[in-house]
C-alpha cells in the first residue's frame, strides 16, 4: 500500500512540474492587457525599470531646496493684505454662525424630537 501511494505521489509531482513548464508565459499577456488599458506609451513607462534619479516612497534622501526662481516670493505689502482678507473672512463666518443657529425649543433636539422607541421620547441628542 505504501509503495502504491508513494509511486502515485511521485507521478503526480512529475505531472505537475511538466504542466507548469509547458504553461505559456503570462508576461506577454500582462503586456497586452497594459497596452489595451493605458496605450503603448504609458505601458512602456510602466514596464521600464526604475532609474537612479527616481525618488521612491519612503526614501531617506533629503529633498533639494528650491532654486530662487521656484521659491515663493513674499512681498511685505501683500502680507498685510492677506491678513486683512483672513480677518474679514473670519468675522463674516462668525456673524453667519450666530444668525444661522435657531434657539432650541424645549424638548427638541437638533433634528426635532428624539424618539428611542415608538412613543418614548429620548433626552439624548444634541
From Swiss-Prot:
Positions of region (Disordered): 44-80
Top-rank taxon, per record: Eukaryota
Gene Ontology MF terms: hormone activity; hormone receptor binding
Tissue distribution of the protein: Brain and spinal cord.
Subcellular localization(s) per the UniProt record: Secreted
Major localisation: secreted
Span of the signal peptide: 1-22
Cystines in this chain: 110-126
Propeptide: 23-102
Pfam families: ANP
Keywords assigned by UniProt, alphabetized: Cleavage on pair of basic residues, Disulfide bond, Hormone, Secreted, Signal, Vasoactive
Biological processes per GO annotation: blood vessel diameter maintenance; cGMP biosynthetic process; receptor guanylyl cyclase signaling pathway
A cellular component term, taken from the record's GO annotations: extracellular region
PANTHER family: C-TYPE NATRIURETIC PEPTIDE (PTHR12167), C-TYPE NATRIURETIC PEPTIDE 2-LIKE (PTHR12167:SF6)
Family of this protein: Belongs to the natriuretic peptide family.
Cited function: Exhibits natriuretic and vasodepressant activity. Has cGMP-stimulating activity. May help to regulate body fluid homeostasis in a variety of aquatic environments.
Entry protein name: C-type natriuretic peptide 2
Lineage: Eukaryota, Metazoa, Chordata, Craniata, Vertebrata
Amino acid at each position: 500500500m505504501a509503495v502504491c501511494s508513494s509511486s502515485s505521489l511521485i507521478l503526480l509531482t512529475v505531472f505537475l512540474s511538466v504542466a507548469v513548464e509547458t504553461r505559456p508565459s503570462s508576461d506577454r499577456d500582462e503586456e497586452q492587457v497594459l497596452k489595451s488599458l493605458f496605450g503603448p506609451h504609458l505601458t512602456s513607462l510602466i514596464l521600464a525599470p526604475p532609474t537612479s534619479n527616481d525618488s521612491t516612497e519612503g526614501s531617506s534622501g533629503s529633498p533639494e531646496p528650491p532654486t530662487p526662481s521656484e521659491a515663493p516670493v513674499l512681498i511685505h505689502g501683500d502680507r498685510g493684505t492677506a491678513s486683512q482678507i483672513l480677518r474679514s473672512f473670519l468675522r463674516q463666518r462668525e456673524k453667519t454662525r450666530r444668525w444661522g443657529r435657531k434657539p432650541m425649543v424645549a424638548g427638541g433636539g437638533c433634528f426635532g424630537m428624539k424618539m428611542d422607541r415608538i412613543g418614548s421620547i429620548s433626552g439624548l441628542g444634541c
